Amino acid sequence: MAKRDYYEILGVDRGADKKEIKKAYRRLARKYHPDVSDDPDAAEKFKEISEAYAVLSDDEKRARYDRFGHAGMDGFSQEDIFNNINFEDIFSGLGFDIGNIFDMFGFGGGRRHGPQRGADISYTLDISLEDAYNGLETDIRVPHTKKCPVCHGSRAEPGTGTRTCQTCGGSGQVRQVRNTILGQMMNITTCPDCQGEGTVVEKPCSNCNGKGVVRKTSTIHVKVPAGVETGSRLRVPGEGEMGLRGGEPGDLYVVIKVKPHSIFRREGANLYTEKPISFVQAALGDTVEVPTLDRPVKLRIPAGTQSGTTFRVKGHGMPHLKWNGYGNLYVKVKVVTPRKLSPRQKELLREFASISGDEIHEDKGFFDKVKDAIIH
């Protein structure tokens, strides 16, 4: 399958300047980076736009591409193409894991000799609405990587060390000169022996298999503030994956999920509920008790209240997470019609209907219908 034109991929004109090219790339990166996109082909699309940007943002590579097309890139390896790209600068503020980008293009080791920060991890914590109202402290068990207790992250068996990689001479890269139709090209690849580190361990640690980290499950104490809602994230610094080569560990993000409640529905800091009342209470008015997440409160029902009327109980909703105070509780009254009435109750209702001028056509029972049939 023929490769697409780099300008077409980024959606820019052939005369676009570097600023326009970078802007187009950042826009597409926000859309297709696998960290944020649900598109099953996002990784391939991200690679495609990244390669287009790497070529068009470099004056020399762009000139070769403009003259020879994709044939002008045949002598370049992936590392050659991305050699001068500063992903940290490009993706500043976008929230992407920069380290994973190198792995995505298959040249992870040769570009990262220094310390590498560990990846952030997330943990979903299910809590009740009452917990979200009051706040809570709890312990969670989180699997993550930690520094190997035997080699202390050195990756080498105790008593041994590391030595300079003989294959690459410590550079982490292997250079090969290739003859192409365009002349000699230098091909630079990650050293296959040291994976770009420049050093190799003399004897890998038997406890961690030379990785420098081990996987374990830790018990972590978490304080959940009052007012959190589904989707709230609590950051626990340093409890993510272990960093590499002395890099800082990542962070743990506890993602809150508030379980549905049997009585209340939540919208932000406000709560909603229903309160059944009798038609007598609705007609004459009354004071009723309604539940809250704190304690029952009194609610005045005015005379003549219609079913479906909503009342506000100020300050009895959820606590605000970022400032003092509480939301409101909204109570929707539902007038309940009695299913069974005593003869006296029916008599009083008929009298009420007569006084009100209402003409009532009651449904007759089975025996009343038989009686009418005999008489008539």
UniProtKB/Swiss-Prot annotation:
Q: Where are the zinc fingers (CR-type)?
A: 135-217
Gene Ontology cellular component list: cytoplasm
Any single biological process term in GO: chaperone cofactor-dependent protein refolding
The UniProt keywords, alphabetically, are: Chaperone, Cytoplasm, DNA replication, Metal-binding, Repeat, Stress response, Zinc, Zinc-finger
Cofactor: record remark:
Binds 2 Zn(2+) ions per monomer.
Determine if Chaperone is one of this entry's keywords: yes
SMART domains named in the record: DnaJ
- Origin superkingdom: Archaea
Query: What InterPro entries would the database entry show?
Result: DnaJ, DnaJ_C, DnaJ_domain, DnaJ_domain_CS, HSP40/DnaJ_pept-bd, HSP_DnaJ_Cys-rich_dom, HSP_DnaJ_Cys-rich_dom_sf, J_dom_sf
Looking at the record, the residues that make up the J domain are 5-69
Annotated compartments? Cytoplasm
Q: Please give the cofactor(s) recorded in the UniProt entry for this protein.
A: Zn(2+)
Q: Where are the CXXCXGXG motif repeats?
A: 148-155, 165-172, 191-198, 205-212
Which residues does the record give as Zn(2+) 2 binding sites?
165, 168, 191, 194
**What is said about the domains?**
The J domain is necessary and sufficient to stimulate DnaK ATPase activity. Zinc center 1 plays an important role in the autonomous, DnaK-independent chaperone activity of DnaJ. Zinc center 2 is essential for interaction with DnaK and for DnaJ activity.
Similarity field = Belongs to the DnaJ family.
Subunit text = Homodimer.
Described function? Participates actively in the response to hyperosmotic and heat shock by preventing the aggregation of stress-denatured proteins and by disaggregating proteins, also in an autonomous, DnaK-independent fashion. Unfolded proteins bind initially to DnaJ; upon interaction with the DnaJ-bound protein, DnaK hydrolyzes its bound ATP, resulting in the formation of a stable complex. GrpE releases ADP from DnaK; ATP binding to DnaK triggers the release of the substrate protein, thus completing the reaction cycle.
Output this protein's name: Chaperone protein DnaJ
- State the organism of origin: Methanothermobacter thermautotrophicus (strain ATCC 29096 / DSM 1053 / JCM 10044 / NBRC 100330 / Delta H)
Give the gene that encodes this protein.
Answer: dnaJ
